[in-house]
Swiss-Prot record:
<dbReference type="InterPro" id="IPR018370">
    <property type="entry name" value="Chaperonin_Cpn60_CS"/>
</dbReference>
<dbReference type="GO" id="GO:0000325">
    <property type="term" value="C:plant-type vacuole"/>
</dbReference>
<keyword id="KW-0067">ATP-binding</keyword>
<keyword id="KW-0496">Mitochondrion</keyword>
<feature type="transit peptide" description="Mitochondrion">
    <location>
        <begin position="1"/>
        <end position="31"/>
    </location>
</feature>
<dbReference type="Pfam" id="PF00118">
    <property type="entry name" value="Cpn60_TCP1"/>
</dbReference>
<dbReference type="GO" id="GO:0005524">
    <property type="term" value="F:ATP binding"/>
</dbReference>
<dbReference type="InterPro" id="IPR027410">
    <property type="entry name" value="TCP-1-like_intermed_sf"/>
</dbReference>
<dbReference type="InterPro" id="IPR027413">
    <property type="entry name" value="GROEL-like_equatorial_sf"/>
</dbReference>
<dbReference type="GO" id="GO:0005739">
    <property type="term" value="C:mitochondrion"/>
</dbReference>
<dbReference type="GO" id="GO:0140662">
    <property type="term" value="F:ATP-dependent protein folding chaperone"/>
</dbReference>
<protein>
    <recommendedName>
        <fullName>Chaperonin CPN60-like 2, mitochondrial</fullName>
    </recommendedName>
</protein>
<dbReference type="InterPro" id="IPR001844">
    <property type="entry name" value="Cpn60/GroEL"/>
</dbReference>
<keyword id="KW-0143">Chaperone</keyword>
<comment type="similarity">
    <text>Belongs to the chaperonin (HSP60) family.</text>
</comment>
<dbReference type="GO" id="GO:0042026">
    <property type="term" value="P:protein refolding"/>
</dbReference>
<dbReference type="InterPro" id="IPR027409">
    <property type="entry name" value="GroEL-like_apical_dom_sf"/>
</dbReference>
Length: 572
């Protein structure tokens, strides 16, 4: 054994050639060389990437924004007006530029994740703050004071936006918000308002491909669980990062599953029935999880595992609700049931299950309608008898999930490209509408940010460098209104100048009609949450790059192509 290790050691030592150069030992091991840049040079290259992505994204802004055609490495080209989709599709060969592009993608993705819309606005604001910030730093402004000034201005603007917010509740107001976010398509706005009316403002609304030329709304029996897939290896659609199971069988287990052998009968049942499998358990661990992933990727079995929702007694109750909805039995020792002795009739069914990173939607459960109604009646009765506010809230939540249903927005179109583009708009409109219901609305078209510049006129700062930070934000707040007008074919500077002369904060420019109107009365409104999130995310990322003093990049290998695959072609 010693001789084997010695030979191995000597062979490793000899395989790495070393030579003495100028008194230093240089190893021929393949360590990646680095390019280091400092100061203006480091920021300039990254700023170029930010600007090029922003220019591509900003053409989509407003009611007369233009389409962007994106080439994909597979399938046909994608045509879209969705800012985050455009941003994600862009990458550069130059590494410094690509870092700038990635920063814009971070802004767009973060805004989209929190507010569901406003990605184009966030990108435009990022470019505006960043360009002025980098110029100021290059001119000798103290970057830390500049940062303080920008943060002070952002806080003041957010406060101003919240003070002018108007809460919405009527179907017409909801329709207006959804229509704006759908780039002026009122039909989409009306369908979203109808969906919210049917399932409630907190209800589940999903977006799916339709089978006709027209958009349709369908309310189906379903349940949403606040649990996503245990492992991303269960994903079936890389583009949407979802796992979709059509007509699956469903196993509901009360405890953790870690033993391979305990799952064999369930997997056999799935294979024999040629149906996907959904597993709901406290957890699926180690060998059992590995076997499921192996069967999916090499055995061709569509399978997904999620953790049971809730904790303690609430978890047990939720699993019982799910069992009633799907026609399953909860496998537990208390009921004398075990995985080793499982029978097909103990498994539940559903027409479709969609699992994301954060939640699971089960549509058309295979449970007996009479039993479901009896379960709902039990919950209503328990809710009336309960004296605990907490218990009442939990019971009402369970009742809503069991009886409320799920609204499915089926997007129609003449081609796959058209359906894809319309789905982007419907998703944006749906998210923006939820945001509007949550935090209220303000005048749209960029005018709320434009008038917020007046709130910064008298903002007190400690020195001129901080004042410069405030001025940067003031100038950046004009960019959205300018861009919307310019995309509609009007002089953005003239429009912005005229609006700033007004005292009425609802007065704005309707770019679709080319008129100056009362924006709220005209139905041109934005959710406060969308604009607030876009502004804060843009400032955050802009400050990261403005305060960057050095960049360390891996030097490109001349023998290999320096291509970074775009996120859209990878399905991200």
């Amino acid at each position: 054994m010693y001789r084997v290790l010695s030979k191995l050691s000597s062979s490793i030592g000899s395989s790495t050639s070393r030579k003495l150069v100028s008194g230093r030992i240089i190893s021929s091991r393949n360590y990646a060389a680095k390019d280091i840049s400092f100061g203006i040079g480091a920021r300039a290259a990254m700023l170029q990437g930010v600007s090029e992505v922003a220019e591509a994204v900003k053409v989509t802004m407003g009611p007369k924004g233009r389409n962007v055609i994106i080439e994909s490495s597979y399938g046909g080209p994608k045509i879209t007006k969705d800012g985050v989709t455009v941003a994600k599709s862009i990458s550069f060969q130059a590494k410094a530029k690509n870092i700038g592009a990635e920063l814009v993608k971070q802004v767009a993705s973060a805004t989209n994740k929190v507010a569901g819309d406003g990605t184009t606005c966030a990108t435009v604001l990022t470019q505006a703050i960043l360009i002025e910030g980098c110029k100021s730093v290059a001119a000798g402004v103290n970057v830390m004071d500049l940062r303080v000034g920008i943060n002070m201005a952002i806080a003041a603007v957010v406060s101003d936006l919240k003070s002018r917010a108007v809460m919405i509740s009527t179907p017409e107001e909801i329709t207006q918000v959804a229509t704006i976010s759908a780039n002026g398509e009122r039909e989409i706005g009306e369908l979203i308002a109808r969906a919210m009316e049917k399932v409630g403002k907190e209800g589940v609304i999903t977006v799916a491909d339709g089978n006709t030329l027209d958009n349709e709304l369908e309310v189906v029996e379903g349940m949403k669980l606040a649990r996503g897939y245990i492992s991303p290896y269960f994903i079936t659609d890389e583009k949407t990062q979802k796992c979709e199971l059509e007509n699956p069988i469903i196993l509901i287990h009360e405890k953790k599953i870690s033993d391979i052998n305990s799952l064999l009968k369930v997997l056999e049942a799935a294979v024999k029935s040629s149906r996907p499998l959904l597993i709901v358990a406290e957890d699926v661990e180690s060998d059992a999880l590995a076997m499921l992933i192996l069967n999916k990727h090499h055995g061709g079995l569509k399978v997904c595992a999620i953790k049971a929702p809730g904790f303690g007694d609430n978890r047990k109750a939720s699993l019982d609700d799910l069992a009633v909805l799907t026609g399953a039995e909860v496998i537990s020792e208390e009921r004398g049931l075990s995985l080793e002795k499982i029978r097909p009739e103990l498994l539940g069914t559903a027409k479709k299950v969609t699992v994301t990173r954060d939640d699971t939607i089960i549509l058309h459960g295979g449970g007996d309608k009479k039993l479901i109604e009896e379960r709902c009646e039990e919950l209503r009765s328990a809710n009336e008898k309960s004296t605990s506010t907490f218990d009442q809230e939990k019971t009402q939540e369970r009742l809503s999930k069991l009886s409320g249903g799920v609204a499915v927005f089926k997007v129609g179109g003449a081609s796959e490209s058209e359906v894809g583009e319309r789905k982007d708009r419907v998703t944006d409109a749906l998210n923006a509408t939820r945001a509007a219901v949550e935090e209220g609305i303000i005048p749209g078209g960029g005018v709320a940010l434009l008038y917020a510049t007046k709130a910064l006129d008298n903002l007190q700062t400690e020195n001129e460098d901080q004042r410069r930070g405030v001025q940067i934000v003031q100038n950046a707040l004009k960019a959205p209104a300018f861009t919307i007008a310019a995309n509609a074919g009007y002089d953005g500077s003239l429009v912005v100048g005229k609006l700033l002369e007004q005292d009425d904060c609802n007065f704005g420019f309707d770019a679709a009609k080319g008129k100056y109107v009362d924006m709220v009365k005209a139905g041109i409104i934005d959710p406060v949450k969308v604009i607030r999130t876009a502004l804060t995310d843009a400032a955050s990322v802009s400050l990261l790059l403005t305060t960057t003093e050095a960049s360390v990049l891996v030097k490109a290998d001349e023998n290999t192509p320096n291509h970074v695959p775009d996120m859209a072609s990878m399905g991200m």
